[in-house]
């Protein structure tokens, strides 16, 4: 058992502190990196910071070395020892104080590091993979007794608040990001996505002392007021000029200001001692002790009272009235009620700032973009806030969907490593049920399968087999059939065929059915049917993705030769009347006829058998297309697995005479570039053709058909007409919606050596590094089950390259032989 989404312009840091120094720039790590404004050599005292933050060096884009008391001597006697440019410490804790002392002795700067405002899914104790940090060379944002880099950034933005185009764009961007953060319910920690209804809690009488004693009318319309409790000893409380007396004042003020309201105290979810929870509370005050989503909770209240919690700023983003009883980084700018804040500190802060007002967008942009730094755990590279949000949304969704016990049911042994890489999530406990071979039958765990817990199977055939088995087994026990998740290859799979045992970088997991089975609904069909109008950000992302797909020539398997204007493939040429052969692309163009590409498929594949088509063989497809288009120029493209001799679907010479050309070894993007229409039963090539705005004629019902984007042949015949009824939307589906649901929402992506699930754009960048020749390192990493430390392609030896090629060739030959024996056995059984 295995337990278990453009670069931002950063405001340049110019220190005003006596102890801080101007920080040199370092080169960004790549196209997705943000400009680095801190030194590239840092030192830390102790091991806690690096151990608790696995991606600290990645987000800071710096080399972090541990500093020992004798490290200064190393610099004297070891010429290879590089002196750090700055020391780093955590907040104002001991690590920072020790780092500051060491930095003063070395006469270099000290930087304070803290968790960012969008930190991770789980709490800091449970997750070492934080997505964001803040770096401060002046102070730290929660200590208002002195200035901080965040305060300086806000002041600078306010002073530059003239109507420049750049600031207008920044304001719009801040509004878009705030809207998305609130819509996705993102906070510092994001393990919980929902919050119980406060009205329902009152109706149920939970934590309701008044109802128990007086039986009052719980359904009376009253407002909700939230008081945010904090952990005793929290450094931000002292930094806000507050103590336990401020919490008492806050409670008293809230009760006096809202005598008829429902007052709630948000306690710390980890059951740590708080200031409010240990007080004697009035009868109309209730405590929320359960883990819940902060944004979902704040959305239900009218007023929020806080001392120094960041939830106060999140309440401002939601348009709530915020009453501060401490001096926060977001208070004193005219956005909050600061009448209860410590007067002396508030006066000092306002005098220091010399700015009386700042907009919400200015505060957000300064804090979340200028001040914060982000890293994507999937790529382990510095990134923008958009990428961090995409990672949080994707990984939280799948961690929630697959939480609990899950049985991986009878997978091939070679698939298990990459299956674990996709679904071995923090809140998922996997049980591996092997195939029923003799050695597995002898294993004690083989018969310990709990058939009442969710199962994960590979492909439609295994799903049907398990459903049939469980219907008989559980009917005797009067138990419902458990959830059966169906896993399959994704739409952007790998640089090679799945039949050669090459691990995928993308899979789909479907709870209802599977995308290629038109006989019943699937999760993808449901996504497409319920797809709402895309936001401006989503449309921008989809358009950029479409451009990337076309520019990088992306296809599912990414196999075949690219056609060059100076060369041709002998296997994809036509005999001409002259002495020189010509390529089929050139011949088709010169013919002046309508060019139709017929896409071959694996005939015994379930995507053909369950697509509702009357035509289910490649030969019949060629015959039908020729019959309906007698004057067209036909090009037939065999399926890669059939072409490699691994699967059934070979077309005889009799039917091949009906076509003018056969694209044996031409890459699919080149095939699509040379035709006018695509004719297919249910191939994914039809979707790739829609990307290129080509006319697509479907003889079956693939996932992209039936929405008004394709020509659906035999739509009036059963059973296809029956299946089409499920796809009748009130509003037409746009191609942007189709692309977003199919490539962004539906699949799961991963990268070798990465943590968590990746995004489609990242997988494309990995598979297409910018040159035609793929490095052997990538092919090897993709095929590996367990993550290994990546090395540069240039460092690979010739022996390693040849070894990888021989391994793939041997695997292909083995699969070809196996397919031949399977065909012989089928003929014998007949």
Regions found by a protein language model. Give the residues of each.
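Catalytic-core helical/loop segments in enzymes performing group transfer/polymerization on anionic/lipid-linked
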Residues: 1-8, 13, 18, 23-830
């Amino acid at each position: 058992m295995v337990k278990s989404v453009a670069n931002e312009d950063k405001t340049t840091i110019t220190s005003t502190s006596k102890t801080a120094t101007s920080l040199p720039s370092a080169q960004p790590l790549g196209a997705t990196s943000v400009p680095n404004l801190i030194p590239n050599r840092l030192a830390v005292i102790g091991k806690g910071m690096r151990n608790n933050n696995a991606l600290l060096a990645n987000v800071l884009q710096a080399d972090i070395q541990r500093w020992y008391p004798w490290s200064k001597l190393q610099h004297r006697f070891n010429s290879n020892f590089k002196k750090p440019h700055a020391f780093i410490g955590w907040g104002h804790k001991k690590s920072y104080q020790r780092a500051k002392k060491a930095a003063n002795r070395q006469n270099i700067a000290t930087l304070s590091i803290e968790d960012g405002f969008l930190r991770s899914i789980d709490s800091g104790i449970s997750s070492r993979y934080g997505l964001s940090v803040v770096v401060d060379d002046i102070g730290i944002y929660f200590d208002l007794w002195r200035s901080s880099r965040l305060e300086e950034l806000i002041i600078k933005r306010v002073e530059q608040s003239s109507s420049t185009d750049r600031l207008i764009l920044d304001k719009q961007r801040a509004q878009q990001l705030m809207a998305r953060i609130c819509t996705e319910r993102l906070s510092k920690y994001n393990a919980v996505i929902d919050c119980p209804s406060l009205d329902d809690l009152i109706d149920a009488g939970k934590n309701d002392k008044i109802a128990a004693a007086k039986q009052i009318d719980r359904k009376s319309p009253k407002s909700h007021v939230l008081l945010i409790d904090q952990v005793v000893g929290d450094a931000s409380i002292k930094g806000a000029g507050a103590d336990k007396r401020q919490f008492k004042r806050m409670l008293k003020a809230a009760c006096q200001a809202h005598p008829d309201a429902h007052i709630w105290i948000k306690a710390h979810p980890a059951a740590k001692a708080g200031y409010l929870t240990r007080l004697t509370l009035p009868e109309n005050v209730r405590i929320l002790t359960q883990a819940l989503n902060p944004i979902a909770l704040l959305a239900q209240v009218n007023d929020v009272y806080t001392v120094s919690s960041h939830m106060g700023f999140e309440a401002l983003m939601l348009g709530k009235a915020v009453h501060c009883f401490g001096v926060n980084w977001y208070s004193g700018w005219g956005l909050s009620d600061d009448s209860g804040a410590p007067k002396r500190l508030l006066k000092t802060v306002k005098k220091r700032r010399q700015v009386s007002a700042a907009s919400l967008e200015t505060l957000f942009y300064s804090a979340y973009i200028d001040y914060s730094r982000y890293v994507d755990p999937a790529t382990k590279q510095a990134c923008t806030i958009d990428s961090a949000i995409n990672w949080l949304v994707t990984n939280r969704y799948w961690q929630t969907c697959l939480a609990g016990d899950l049985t991986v049911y009878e997978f091939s042994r070679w698939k298990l490593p990459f299956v674990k890489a996709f679904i071995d999530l923090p809140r998922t406990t996997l049980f591996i049920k092997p195939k029923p071979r003799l050695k597995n039958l002898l294993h004690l765990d083989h018969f310990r399968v709990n058939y009442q817990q969710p199962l994960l199977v590979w492909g439609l055939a295994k799903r049907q087999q398990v459903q049939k088995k469980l219907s008989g087994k559980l009917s005797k026990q009067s138990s419902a059939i458990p959830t059966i998740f169906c896993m399959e290859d994704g739409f952007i799979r790998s640089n090679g065929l799945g039949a050669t045992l090459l691990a995928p970088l993308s899979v789909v997991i479907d709870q209802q059915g599977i995308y290629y089975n038109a006989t019943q609904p699937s999760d993808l069909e449901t996504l497409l049917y319920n797809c709402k109008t895309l936001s401006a950000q989503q449309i921008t992302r989809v358009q950029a993705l479409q451009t990337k797909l076309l520019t990088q020539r992306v296809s599912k398997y990414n196999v075949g030769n690219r056609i060059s204007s100076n060369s041709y493939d002998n296997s994809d040429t036509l005999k001409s009347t002259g002495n020189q052969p010509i390529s089929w692309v050139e011949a088709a163009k010169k013919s002046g006829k309508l060019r139709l590409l017929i896409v071959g498929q694996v005939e015994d594949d379930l995507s053909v058998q369950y697509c509702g088509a009357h035509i289910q063989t490649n030969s019949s497809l060629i015959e039908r297309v020729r019959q309906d288009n007698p004057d067209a120029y036909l090009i037939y493209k065999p399926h890669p697995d059939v072409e490699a001799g691994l699967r059934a679907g070979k077309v005889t010479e009799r039917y091949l005479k009906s076509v003018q050309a056969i694209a044996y070894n031409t890459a699919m993007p080149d095939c699509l570039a040379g035709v006018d229409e695509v004719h297919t039963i249910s191939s994914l090539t039809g979707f790739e053709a829609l990307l290129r705005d080509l006319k697509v004629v479907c003889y079956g019902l693939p996932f992209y058909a039936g929405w008004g984007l394709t020509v659906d042949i035999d739509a009036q015949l059963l059973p296809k007409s029956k299946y089409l009824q499920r796809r009748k939307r009130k509003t037409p589906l746009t191609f942007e919606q189709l692309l977003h649901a199919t490539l962004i929402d539906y699949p799961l992506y991963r990268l070798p050596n990465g943590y968590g699930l990746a995004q489609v754009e990242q997988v494309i960048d990995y598979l297409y590094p910018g040159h035609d020749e793929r490095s052997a390192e990538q092919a090897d990493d993709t095929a590996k089950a367990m993550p290994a430390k990546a090395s540069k392609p240039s460092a690979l030896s010739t022996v390693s390259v040849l070894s990888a090629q021989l391994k793939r060739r041997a695997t292909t030959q083995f699969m070809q032989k196996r397919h031949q024996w399977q065909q012989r056995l089928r003929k014998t059984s007949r």
